[in-house]
């Protein structure tokens, strides 16, 4: 599963995220035991991962980003961090240039699809992306221009075991799962015999 961590939307449609019900709802999500059905977010993979995530948030806020919700460790044992929303993130911030492995999202305001694509492709990472559009052809055109290993259109949740999984750039090379994943386990050999 790939979770979208960076949302890029047109400035003309952007509303104050603090007024949106989804952002407000994030502050009410429960962290805890991932085996408990009432839990929304389990712990991060390690104490170091939780520390890195909080450092990315603190770095962004110290350099002018707006923390809309979350951003703090959850009290008690375990590598838990609150669900977090950041806006006004710039290229000088770690949250802009580093992969985020935590329950957080960075919201960018862009002029149009071209700027969103340029911003997305400027990342050193390229595991996956999601395109939302009412126009299927426009969504496909944007997906074709994204430098990522996977793109979902109008849903970040679609998945099946026979679909190839993998990224581009620093998010990896090659694919796992599906027929393309089998190629990762096959040694191919070229044998050349000159004519004559």
Question: Whereabouts are the PLM-identified features?
Answer:
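NAD(P)-dependent aldehyde/semialdehyde dehydrogenase
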Residues: 8-124
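Extended low-complexity, polyampholyte segments enriched in Ser/Thr/Pro and acidic residues
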Residues: 1-2
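Conserved C-terminal structural/oligomerization subdomain of aldehyde/semialdehyde dehydrogenase
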Residues: 30-31, 73, 80-196
